[in-house]
Amino acid sequence: GKMDIKEEHYEKEFIDINKMLEQITDRFALTHPEKNFIKHIPKSPIFVEGDQDKLTQVFDNIVNNAIKYSPNGKNITIRVRQNYHHNRVSISIKDEGVGIPLVHIDKIFNRFYRVDKSRQRSMGGTGLGLALAKNIIEAHKGRIWAQSREGYGSIIFVTLPCEQIDDEWL
């Protein structure tokens, strides 16, 4: 299959990223009651300009991976922070799962890359997931990267440009 990101059509609309992440987390919390979701998501809206469906797909994929790699009862923490100038938002999704070996950490965003084939089979493939996520985030002028400690879990970080819309405009 040919997938050239340049041919993709991106919608442009203002999306409340906090509301989106609340909804995604709440949906997974319903379908995976055995997982422990912790949300640090501000109540006031933070707006990102972009494609709602594609960004939802990205965060769905990241949270779904966190669920797959986290033992039951461990925490999955979704955190949203704005930088000092309120022009970038940083989202982190942290699991307390098996972690990713350091030698693999930068390769997980490559197409069809798999950390461990034997483990992957039981987990279901995430080959295209993070590569596609990277394409989508970069098309939104953002960045995505990972940190991990084997045996302690992983954190996926996403930063995106955002707009702080004053309350009086809402």
Locate predicted features.
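Short helix-loop "hinge" at the ATP-lid/N-box region of the Bergerat-fold HATPase_c
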Residues: 66-67
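Short conserved segment of the HATPase_c
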Residues: 100-112
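A conserved beta-strand-to-alpha-helix junction within the catalytic ATP-binding
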Residues: 11-26
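Short beta-strand/loop element within the Bergerat-fold HATPase_c
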Residues: 73-87
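Conserved micro-motifs of the catalytic ATP-binding
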Residues: 5-10, 47-50
